[in-house]
Amino acid sequence: MAEITKADVVAFIEKMTVLELAELVKELEEKFGVSAAAPVAVAAAAPAAAAEAAEEKTEFDVILKSAGANKINVIKVVRTLTSLGLKEAKDLVDGAPSPVKTGISKAEAEEAQKQLVEAGAEVEIK
């Protein structure tokens, strides 16, 4: 039996009438349990959902981008903020960019950022 290529399928479909194409689409939808119209409706709703999520952000992450010149002071602040041991705090600072605190309130994130910046670190809130 000869192999059917994509080009053969396209050539066959080109010769079909609109009515035959509509019936083919309906049969394919039934056979595979899909709908040809669903992606259009979902794509239209997605941007609205994304906008709502951006407005309702309640949890923030404090990301240490770099320790700057005062690495020791930054390590001290990281230990205070996270209750990590000296080695763990040093590893976190050395591994920048890395998250210092995750899933915290905006006020807490801004306070942590303020303390880290005062110690000489470069910080980002996401």
From Swiss-Prot:
Key word Ribosomal protein present: yes
One Gene Ontology molecular-function label? mRNA binding
UniProt-listed CDD domains: Ribosomal_L7_L12
One biological process GO term for this chain? translation
Under InterPro entries, the record lists: Ribosomal_bL12 (IPR000206), Ribosomal_bL12_C (IPR013823), Ribosomal_bL12_C/ClpS-like (IPR014719), Ribosomal_bL12_oligo (IPR008932), Ribosomal_bL12_oligo_N_sf (IPR036235)
Task: Report the GO terms under cellular component.
Answer: cytosolic large ribosomal subunit
Q: Which UniProt keywords apply?
A: Ribonucleoprotein, Ribosomal protein
Pfam families named in the record: Ribosomal_L12, Ribosomal_L12_N
NCBIfam families, per this entry?
L12
Q: What family is this protein classified in?
A: Belongs to the bacterial ribosomal protein bL12 family.
PANTHER family in UniProt? 39S RIBOSOMAL PROTEIN L12, LARGE RIBOSOMAL SUBUNIT PROTEIN BL12M
What is its biological role?
Answer: Forms part of the ribosomal stalk which helps the ribosome interact with GTP-bound translation factors. Is thus essential for accurate translation.
- Report quaternary structure and partners: Homodimer. Part of the ribosomal stalk of the 50S ribosomal subunit. Forms a multimeric L10(L12)X complex, where L10 forms an elongated spine to which 2 to 4 L12 dimers bind in a sequential fashion. Binds GTP-bound translation factors.
Q: What is this protein called?
A: Large ribosomal subunit protein bL12
Q: What is the lineage of its organism?
A: Bacteria, Pseudomonadati, Thermodesulfobacteriota, Desulfuromonadia, Geobacterales
What's the gene? rplL
